[in-house]
Amino acid sequence: MGQLVNGVWTKGSVSNNQKDGSFKRVDSVFRNEISINSQIYKPETNRYHLYVSYACPWAHRTLIFRYLKKLENHISVDYVHPDMLDNGWSFLKNFPKTTGDSLYGKKYVHEIYQISEKNVSSKATVPILWDKKTNTIVNNESAEIIRIMNSAFNDITKNYDDYYPSNLRIEIDKINKVIYENINNGVYKSGFSRTQEAYEDAVKKLFSSLEMIDEILENKEYLVGNVLTEADIRLIPTLLRFDSVYYCLLYTSPSPRDVIQ
């Protein structure tokens, strides 16, 4: 997948690997909040829009929150084509349930980034939380988008269900870190490693963390406390894709293979 460099789409793979061959995810660029205290992004119905892909686990978690928080009539959504090719995510509509770009009629997701910021340097990822009023990206970090959805629109939806309750936040943050580093991102660390040592280290951490999850859930339904929280929702999209996608494409086997030539 390419990326935007000073507003220009650059094709070809851009390495995210460290000197030791391990994979490091690039931080998201747009990190704004929606809040009554925000100078720009206030909570409003039908002002905000999601760009997502059904193929993307990071986007999947935002769709779960959109549903749970009763935001489906307040935040609109477009579904991109699940194949990511030379021009990145596209708005082709030749796949079931893809919508095209209903706002601007663009062909590619990177063009949405260019609308928001002409000279942006960024990966053109989904999910994107978009502001239709200012024609800008509010946020493209899924972990922050779900936090926004959890609380910013409560007074509009009258849905006060809290998936990041204050009394459980320390525990949620602790397990979120393990889930992100070793499972959510761990599957990519496995598949995108460039040395055998980095690959085996990623696989070891992945499966030890999955064993930890198994132990936690052996006698209870949820990861933290006795209620559904953000931690569960962050884990689910990865687990759903594990056997059918990651095992095949990213070599997530409990017995590491000789995959680095």
Predicted regions, residues:
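Acidic, serine/threonine/proline-rich low-complexity intrinsically disordered regions
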Residues: 200, 247-253
